[in-house]
Amino acid sequence: MQTLTYAQARLAAFLFFSASGLAYGLFTARIPSLKEQTGAASDELGLVLFALGAASVVGLSGAAALVRRFGVKAVSLAGSLIFFFGLLVAGLAEQVAVLAVATALVGLGFGLLDVAVNVAGIEVERRWKKASMNVIHAGYNVGVVAGSISAAVFTGLAVAPLWNFVLPCAILLLVLLRAQHYLPVPEELQQSSAEKPKTKSRVTGFVVFCGVLSSATYVTEGAAAEWGSLFLHQVQGAPESMAALCYGVFGSCALACRLIADRLRAAYGDVNVFLTGAVIALCGMTIVLFAPHWTVSLAGYAVFGTGLAPVVPILFALAGRFGGMPLERATSVVALFAYGGLLFFPPFFGFLAEHWGLLRSLSVTLLLLTGLLAGGIVLKRGDKRRRGV
């Protein structure tokens, strides 16, 4: 049997993350076309998108048990197949109810894949003792960019969403069928079902702490994704075409940072990179909110994306390494907090904006980022205790 190498394992996890990003990028970019295709009203579309979040939580909640029962490789591939099938159904949908079912399938697949591939990513770091999670998570950013570009091209050519979904996903699926064989499996998950312990482990405080910090991180990212362009246009006076660059600038800088962050982790340590990222993110969002001109605010989003990028991958790595729980359960808990924050909390900024205005509403992110920085200080103290400093 061929020995699995570090490069093969890291690339396999990267590719599965890119599949998730590709599907999300394709789906979100073609929402206007799907809305027109199904005749969905705005409130109906809101319920459709809620189905995405709700189904994701279901997938995240059940993924740990499935990973333990069927393994990392099977659940990663199954999650990918489920959300690719969901995209196929969405492309065929002519009724809102069918689109809602399709969206739920996409969300369910996301949840299952996220936990499984994070388990694989943590195992890459654990087995080869090399910082890798940021590069692996960068696969998601690459997939989102590829999906968005693909959607722009297909939309410009007046190609229906169905074919826009089928062609890129079919190509990537062929790659994943090969890549699954190179996903590393933790030793404790290689036992037969009869050998695996039946006792249920309790969720530890440290894993919950990592989950809360990851949730705060993704709430602020969701605020940038869903409200950043509107803030630049309505509050800072940016032209609509320039305001639309907001999340692209944020995402591009996040991708660039993730590609180098593992080297920084290896050189300076997880907690130091975490703290530095939190400080940079807080400075970036402060620039965004209080800049005198929209161009400076847009630059602030670049700083914000750079600082926020390494935080969540580090939290997954720490939870897997020091959580005191089975790897798949620790990963599931952190993912549930993280994506719960990303999917459910950003819409509340709209409610706050109705009462306080958009500037004050988004100022809540400064409190969250301050809490993230405080959490980093707690992690730093814990790191010193572990090292006996």
Language-model segments: residues:
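Short hydrophobic/small-residue motifs within alpha-helical transmembrane segments
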Residues: 53-54, 141-146, 251-252, 256, ...
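Helix-loop-helix hairpin linking two adjacent transmembrane segments in secondary transporters
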Residues: 136-184
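Short amphipathic helix-loop junctions that connect adjacent transmembrane helices
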Residues: 29-43, 226-242
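Helix-to-loop junctions at the C-terminal end of transmembrane segments
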Residues: 59-71, 155, 257-269, 353-354
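C-terminal transmembrane helical hairpin of 12-TM major facilitator-type secondary transporters
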Residues: 268-315
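Cytoplasmic helix-loop-helix junction between adjacent transmembrane helices
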Residues: 103-139
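Helix-breaking motifs and short loop linkers at transmembrane-helix boundaries and internal kinks
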Residues: 39, 71, 92-97, 237, ...
